[in-house]
Regions:
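Non-catalytic beta-sheet/beta-sandwich ligand-binding modules that flank or precede catalytic cores
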Residues: 1-374
Length: 374
C-alpha cells in the first residue's frame, strides 16, 4: 500500500540553528576611563576602547587580543578586557609614565591581533581592521609634573603701610579651588613668614596673583622667603615641585627714642658750671639706626632754668645716636642761668615740616619721650 506522506511538519528546534555568515566589525571608539580628572589621564589611569560587531562574538584567544591606540606620537597596545559573548569587545590600556597627548587619544587604522574572533557558530571574523578614530579631547594625557617658571614679589623691602603683589607663573594650568580636582591650589600652599597672603586669583589657571601684607610691629628681618609647598597639582593630578622667592625684608616697627643725655661739653669748670661760650652736646639715642633729613632745621628743646632754649641738630644720620649742640650765651645779654642743671621737658624733639627722622626701611620715628631730668 502506498504511504500517506502528509504531515503537520516539525516545529523550530533552537538546538540546530544555522549561521554561515562571519561577524564583521562595525565601529570603534573610546568609551570610558578610570582615574581621569578634568578630561586628563595620568600615569596609572586606564582608558577603554570598545569595538562593536554585527553579532555576538567570542574571544578564543584566552585574553591575548590586542589593538593599537595612538597616545601622542606613540602607538600603545590596549589588551582585551571584557565583552566575550557580547557584540562589544572592550580593550583597556593603562597610562604609563612618560605618556603625553595634549590633543586627546586617537585610534589609527589597524587590525585587532593576537587571536581569533568568532561568532557563536564558529564563523571567524575575517575583517577586523578598525577605521581611524580622531583625537578625543575628553581623554587627553598628561604625566609630566608642572614647573614654576616665575615666583616673585613686587616689593622685597616692606615697611609700615606697604604690601606686595605675589606672582606665580606655572608651565601649565594648575588645579583651582573647585570640585573638579582632587587637590586644589590655594594660599594655604604657601608659607609666608612675617606676613599673610590673600586669596589667590587667576584668569587662566597658569598665572596666579595674591597680595602679601606684612605683620605689624616686626623688627627688621631680611631672612624671609615665601615657600611654595608640594600640595598642588596640574589639571591631570601631577604634583608640582616646591619653590621659593628671593629673600624679602620686613620692618614694620617704628624707631623710638630710648634716651636723651648730655654726652659732651667744653669749658665746664671744675665745679660743673658752664660759662658763656661753652658748648654742650645732647645725644638722643633711638631704638635703631635712623636717617635724618634736616632740611627744615631739626632741634631739641632744653630747659635753661625756667626758659626754653633750642639745641640745633649737628650729626648722627645713619646711626642710632643723634647729636644736638648748644652754646651758652652771656647772662647779661640773654639771662641764661640754671643753678639746678640742664634738662629737657617731655617731647623735646622739634621736627618742623620738611624735616624727617626715619629708620633705614623708611618708617617715621616716634619722637615722643618723657625728657631728660636735671
Amino acid at each position: 500500500n502506498s504511504a500517506i506522506i502528509t504531515h503537520a511538519g516539525m516545529s523550530t528546534n533552537s538546538s540546530y540553528k544555522v549561521d554561515t555568515i562571519p561577524p564583521t566589525e562595525e565601529g570603534a571608539g573610546i568609551t570610558g576611563a578610570v582615574g581621569a580628572q578634568n578630561n586628563f589621564l595620568n600615569a596609572g589611569d586606564t582608558v577603554d576602547v570598545s569595538v562593536t560587531f554585527s553579532e555576538v562574538v567570542l574571544d578564543t584567544s584566552s585574553g591575548s587580543l590586542t589593538l593599537k591606540i595612538a597616545v601622542g606620537s606613540d602607538n600603545e597596545t590596549a589588551t582585551i578586557n571584557s565583552g566575550s559573548t557580547t557584540d562589544n569587545l572592550t580593550f583597556r590600556y593603562t597610562i604609563q609614565a612618560g605618556d603625553n597627548d595634549t590633543n586627546g587619544i586617537s585610534i589609527d587604522a589597524n587590525d585587532i591581533s593576537g587571536g581569533t574572533i568568532t561568532d557563536l557558530a564558529g564563523n571567524i571574523a575575517s575583517d577586523v581592521t578598525l577605521e581611524a578614530v580622531t583625537d578625543n579631547s575628553s581623554y587627553k594625557v598628561d604625566t609630566a609634573a608642572p614647573s614654576v617658571d616665575n615666583f616673585t614679589m613686587s616689593d622685597t623691602a616692606l615697611k609700615i603701610g606697604d604690601n606686595a603683589t605675589v606672582t606665580f607663573v606655572f608651565s601649565e594650568q594648575i588645579c583651582p579651588e573647585t570640585d573638579s580636582c582632587a587637590v586644589e591650589f590655594t594660599n594655604s600652599d604657601i608659607t609666608a613668614p612675617n606676613g599673610s597672603l590673600s586669596t589667590l586669583a587667576t584668569s587662566d589657571n597658569t598665572t596666579w596673583t595674591g597680595t602679601f601684607v606684612p605683620t605689624d610691629d616686626v623688627q627688621l628681618d631680611d631672612s624671609n622667603v615665601l615657600t611654595l609647598g608640594t600640595s598642588y597639582t596640574d589639571l591631570a593630578g601631577n604634583t608640582g615641585p616646591t619653590e621659593q622667592t628671593a629673600n624679602y625684608e620686613v620692618d614694620t616697627r617704628e624707631p623710638t627714642v630710648s634716651s636723651i643725655a648730655i654726652t659732651a661739653q667744653s669749658g665746664i669748670s671744675s665745679y660743673n658750671f658752664l660759662n658763656p661760650g661753652d658748648n654742650v652736646s645732647f645725644t638722643v639715642t633711638f631704638s635703631e639706626q635712623v636717617v635724618v633729613d634736616n632740611s627744615s632745621g631739626l632741634s631739641l628743646t632744653i630747659l635753661m632754668g625756667s626758659d626754653n632754649r633750642s639745641a640745633q641738630y649737628t650729626s648722627g644720620s645713619g646711626n642710632a645716636q643723634q647729636v644736638f649742640g648748644y652754646t651758652i650765651d652771656d647772662l647779661l645779654t640773654s639771662g641764661e642761668n640754671d643753678s639746678d642743671g640742664l634738662s629737657t621737658g617731655s617731647n623735646p624733639i622739634v621736627l618742623p615740616g620738611g624735616s624727617t627722622i626715619k629708620d633705614l626701611a623708611g618708617n617715621s620715628a616716634i619722637i615722643t619721650h618723657a625728657g631728660m631730668s636735671t
